[in-house]
Curated annotation (Swiss-Prot):
Pfam families: 7tm_1 (PF00001). Coiled coil: none annotated. Disulfide bonds join C97-C174. Residues 321-337 have a biased composition (Polar residues). This is Hydroxycarboxylic acid receptor 2. The chain crosses the membrane at residues 31-51, 61-81, 99-119, 141-161, 190-210, 227-247, 271-291. It is found in: Cell membrane.
Length: 360
């Protein structure tokens, strides 16, 4: 196959573009599952945040913004799936193409940023329980969240004013990750948004685990399970994002070495990149697990709902008037998830005394 078979000029840059039929066969089912489970999980999380939380704390504000970012990313997946199903033939026009790519990039980056903020918040609450950052007001947390959203939009807004749709034979290509002989801002952000948060998450997770072991808390079986959860969060982040980043770096190396003189050498890495890129959306699908274990509100809510259903079934009693939202304020009589006890704000009712009383 000659260079011209896959060669395409995009915005004045020489690029290699592929329309691999394997993408149309493999990725739509994967994205479909991510969409369904991600929509259910994040939609339920937002519903609980909006209608069943009676009190707000800074940590919950950060979790809420994480849920918003994940939800906005997930709702873009049907359009991306349609693009893959039609073998890289975008059918919705130039402006929708820009909006979709912007939403995917902005909310992927926003999701990573707020997941990192949650990790930092847990770090200060467990390792430095008396630090002034643990006492920031809801207003300050909201201002920080607005600043982070502004930063995220500023780093990805170029996708809105750049023409992202290119005629490719009989099809219209809509992609922000074509293989072009130039290192773009978008590529730099794709790498930075992984390595910097990864370093922060690993540092925070490691310090939390080390701090608990120094206090000899890790001998407790329940704390061991909580520590395992912290490690799982970091591992899932790596599994979701590292493969696509590694393949992208490989593409940069090939471009540095061979330019785009022969597009055939990029065929396999192009397929590998878009396959692994679909794994990054899995992180947004799995983030509701973080919400569940990071706040007593979620396990309390589900426990209350299950207890009500069981009570109705077994006793046939009418539902009482006690509001579910009261349960979410942290009723001390409610048994919480043990991993949540470690990850939650020590000042919340229901948090274990060995976290709240630590003064080191």
């Amino acid at each position: 196959m000659s260079k011209s078979d896959h060669f395409l000029v995009i915005n004045g840059k020489n690029c290699c573009v592929f329309r691999d039929e394997n993408i149309a066969k493999v990725l739509p089912p994967v994205l479909g599952l991510e969409f369904v489970f991600g929509l259910l999980g994040n939609g339920l999380a937002l519903w609980i945040f909006c209608f069943h939380l009676k009190s707000w704390k800074s940590s919950r504000i950060f979790l809420f913004n994480l849920a918003v970012a994940d939800f906005l990313l997930i709702i873009c997946l049907p359009f991306l799936t349609d693009n893959y199903v039609h073998n890289w033939d975008w059918r919705f026009g130039g402006i929708p193409c820009r909006v979709m790519l912007f939403m995917l990039a902005m909310n992927r980056q926003g999701s990573i940023i707020f997941l990192t903020v949650v990790a930092v918040d847990r770090y200060f609450r467990v390792v430095h329980p008396h630090h002034f950052l643990n006492k920031i007001s809801n207003r300050t947390a909201a201002i920080i969240s607005c600043f982070l959203w502004g930063l995220t939009i500023g780093l990805t807004v170029h996708l809105l004013y750049t023409n992202m749709m290119t005629k490719n034979g009989e099809a219209y290509l809509c992609s922000s990750f074509s293989i072009c002989y130039n290192f773009r801002w978008h590529d730099a952000m794709f790498l930075l948004e992984f390595f910097l948060p990864l370093a922060i998450i690993l540092f925070c997770s490691g310090r939390i685990i080390w701090s608990l072991r120094q206090r000899q808390m890790d001998r407790h079986a329940k704390i061991k399970r909580a520590i395992n959860f912290i490690m799982v969060v970091a591992i899932v982040f790596i599994i979701c994002f590292l493969p696509s980043v590694a393949v992208r770096i490989r593409i940069f190396w090939l471009l540095y070495k061979y330019n785009v003189r022969n597009c055939d050498i990029y065929s396999s890495v192009d397929l590998a990149f878009f396959t692994t890129l679909s794994f990054t959306y899995m992180n947004s699908m799995l983030d509701p697990v973080v919400y569940y274990f990071s706040s007593p509100s979620f396990p309390n809510f589900f426990s209350t709902c299950i207890n009500r259903c069981l009570r109705k079934k077994t006793l046939g009693e009418p539902d009482n008037n006690r509001s579910t939202s009261v349960e979410l304020t942290g009723d001390p009589s409610t048994t919480r998830s043990i991993p949540g006890a470690l990850m939650a704000d020590p000042s919340e009712p229901g948090s274990p005394p060995y976290l709240a009383s630590t003064s080191r």
